[in-house]
Amino acid sequence: MPLEKLKDLHLDEQNMQPETREVNGILMSKMMSENWDKIWNFQAKPDDLLIATYAKAGTTWTQEIVDMIQNDGDVQKCQRANTYDRHPFIEWTLPPPLNSGLDLANKMPSPRTLKTHLPVQMLPPSFWKENSKIIYVARNAKDCLVSYYYFSRMNKMLPDPGTLGEYIETFKAGKVLWGSWYDHVKGWWDVKDKHRILYLFYEDMKEDPKREIKKIVKFLEKDISEEVLNKIIHHTSFDVMKQNPMANYTTLPSSIMDHSISPFMRKGMPGDWKNYFTVAQSEDFDEDYRKKMAGSTITFRTEI
């Protein structure tokens, strides 16, 4: 059953808030943890493309860019279904009769484009064995945190984040779904030169979408005209995507995602964290950040 049919199920909102469990030290929903053996044993294919990110790091944006490239800028083809059905979210597990990510992925003909938020050590090993291409997108911690906080408030399938102050501490401790942001971005960074991985930064994509989309085109071994490239830049701009029901999750009932609390696509601007962190919170966060990121060669911009 597609996600849009959720409104027909008359789901109890109180029951949508998930129980959580840890799998190998990483927090997941109880349903994901119960399905973990199947997720771990998922069979990737050599022609799969995996879009991997930490939550709220530009995943849907990258999915739309990739879909437009694969379909040579054909907007109609990219409107064929919502993002969830076009690019199965491999670990996301939903109660029957809804389609979980694995169900959708296993039914999908090749070549498949898939999505994950899994940290690198939790990625099903078949992706490495089959040498599937992977695009990883990283976003600076403070903006990621604020976006994840508001997403957790509006998405009834995620744990209640509490206040922003409480959530900052939860985020720093890595006690959110998919675990520590710090370990996630560093883990994928450390393997980027050992596999077919294109590692991108959200801030770079915002600063110069044309340059970054060209990197994706090259990685996918595609050849597109300047006209198609400009069409992709326009169609995947924040303002256009915010109005696209096949990408902005507005087709879901408010019992699942309540856009009156916060839209799925909120602002998307690097540096927006400054509107939410107090000076003290920012200084405390920065001190903790330096300790957790010590020794890593990865660098982030917190504004552009």
UniProtKB/Swiss-Prot annotation:
Q: Does the keyword Kinase apply?
A: no
UniProt KW keywords: Cytoplasm, Transferase
- Gene3D superfamilies in the record: P-loop containing nucleotide triphosphate hydrolases
- Principal place of residence: cytoplasm
Q: In which tissues is it expressed?
A: Expressed only in olfactory tissue. Detected in sustentacular cells in the dorso-medial portion of the nasal cavity.
State where substrate binds: K115, T116, H117
BP GO annotations: 3'-phosphoadenosine 5'-phosphosulfate metabolic process; sulfur compound metabolic process; xenobiotic metabolic process
Residues annotated as binding 3'-phosphoadenylyl sulfate are 56-61, 139, 147, 202, 236-241, 264-268
How the protein is activated or inhibited is described as: Inhibited by 2,6-dichloro-4-nitrophenol but not by triethylamine or tetra-n-butyl-ammonium chloride.
- Example of a GO MF term: 3'-phosphoadenosine 5'-phosphosulfate binding
- InterPro entries attached to this UniProt entry: P-loop_NTPase, Sulfotransferase_dom
Q: Where is the active site?
A: H117
Q: Name one Pfam family in it.
A: Sulfotransfer_1
Q: Where in the cell is it found?
A: Cytoplasm
- Record's Gene Ontology CC terms? cytoplasm
Q: Which domain of life is it from?
A: Eukaryota
Assigned EC number: 2.8.2.-
Q: What does this protein do?
A: Sulfotransferase that utilizes 3'-phospho-5'-adenylyl sulfate (PAPS) as sulfonate donor to catalyze the sulfate conjugation of drugs, xenobiotic compounds, hormones, and neurotransmitters. May be involved in the activation of carcinogenic hydroxylamines. Shows activity towards p-nitrophenol and N-hydroxy-2-acetylamino-fluorene (N-OH-2AAF). Also shows activity towards cinnamyl alcohol at pH 6.4 but not at pH 5.5, and towards a number of phenolic odorants including eugenol, guaiacol and 2-naphthol.
Please state which protein family the record places this protein in.
Answer: Belongs to the sulfotransferase 1 family.
Protein name from the UniProt record: Sulfotransferase 1C1
